[in-house]
Amino acid sequence: MHRPQNRTAALLAAFGCALAYLPAGRALAAVCAALPLSAAGQSFALHCAAAPLAEELVFQGAVQGLLRPLGPRAAVCVQAALFAVQHGGAAGIAYALVLGVLLGTIRQRTGRVWPGWVLHTVNNLLVFAAG
C-alpha cells in the first residue's frame, strides 16, 4: 500500500528537481558568460567544465537518487528521459537519452557520480572539439 505513494512522491520530487535545473542552467550559463574569457573560452567553460558537473549532480545524483523507489532500471530510464529533454531538438534529445542511460547505469553500478562526470566531460570535450 505504501509503495505507490512512495513511487508517486519519488516521481514528483524528481520532476521538481529536473524543473529546478532549467533556471539554474541558465544562471550557470550567465556566470560563464561573465568570465573574462573570449566567447570560445566562455563556451568551453560552460560546456566542458561547469555543465557536466552540474548535470551529473542534478540528474544522476539527485534525480536518480529520488527515483530509487521505482527500482534501478526505472530510475535510470526516467532520469535519462528528464536529462534528455533538457538538451534541445530531436537529435539532441535522442543523443542525450542514450548518454543519460549510460551515465545513469554507471551511477547505478558504481554508486558514485564522479565516473559519469568524467565520461560526460570527455563527451562534451569531443563534441566541442568537433564543432
Locate each region found by the language model:
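Transmembrane helix-loop-helix hairpins at the membrane interface
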Residues: 14-29, 40-131
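Membrane-helix interface linkers and caps
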Residues: 1-12, 66, 70
